[in-house]
Amino acid sequence: MKQSTELMTFFKALLEKEHFSSQGEIVEALVNAGFNNINQSKVSRMLSKSGAVRTRNAKQEMLYCLPAELGIPIITSPLKNLVLDIDRNDSMIVIRTSPGAAQLIARLLDSIGKTEGILGNIAGDDTIFTTPTNSKKIQETMNIIKNLFN
């Protein structure tokens, strides 16, 4: 049996990555992950404790999710803690940040500029689209960005 802190950490990560429309689906996912003694009432308490809410997504489906406010950066947050994920395709790098941090991180990346392979950035609230100066060197540019936040 895995410990309750490990369960709660896994539970929150699961809610961030997966889409669940019912508590039964969450129970099934936790049991499949190796957690014992999981039932609907326990999941209900965990949802309440974590502050999770059931809300509609863009497809009008009701899903459980953690509120964005839980990730609001504070004045003492190191910049590297504000960057949650960095990924790319063949033409663009996408950087996911804590809510409210994207413009700060984008401004930092803009200051680095073309010398490090960054042509420009567009930032929303929690997502940055970064265009490299050379799409053939996009992996190299992504590595430079990752090294800034490790």
UniProtKB/Swiss-Prot annotation:
GO biological process: L-arginine biosynthetic process; protein complex oligomerization; regulation of arginine biosynthetic process
UniProtKB keywords: Amino-acid biosynthesis, Arginine biosynthesis, Cytoplasm, DNA-binding, Repressor, Transcription, Transcription regulation
Protein name: Arginine repressor
Stated role: Regulates arginine biosynthesis genes.
A GO molecular-function annotation: arginine binding
Entry-linked Pfam families: Arg_repressor (PF01316), Arg_repressor_C (PF02863)
NCBIfam families the record matches: argR_whole, PRK05066.1
Taxonomic lineage of the native organism: Bacteria, Pseudomonadati, Pseudomonadota, Gammaproteobacteria, Alteromonadales
PANTHER family: ARGININE REPRESSOR
Gene Ontology annotations for the cellular component aspect, listed alphabetically: cytoplasm
The family this protein is said to belong to: Belongs to the ArgR family.
Subcellular location(s) per record: Cytoplasm
Pathway(s) per entry: Amino-acid biosynthesis; L-arginine biosynthesis [regulation]
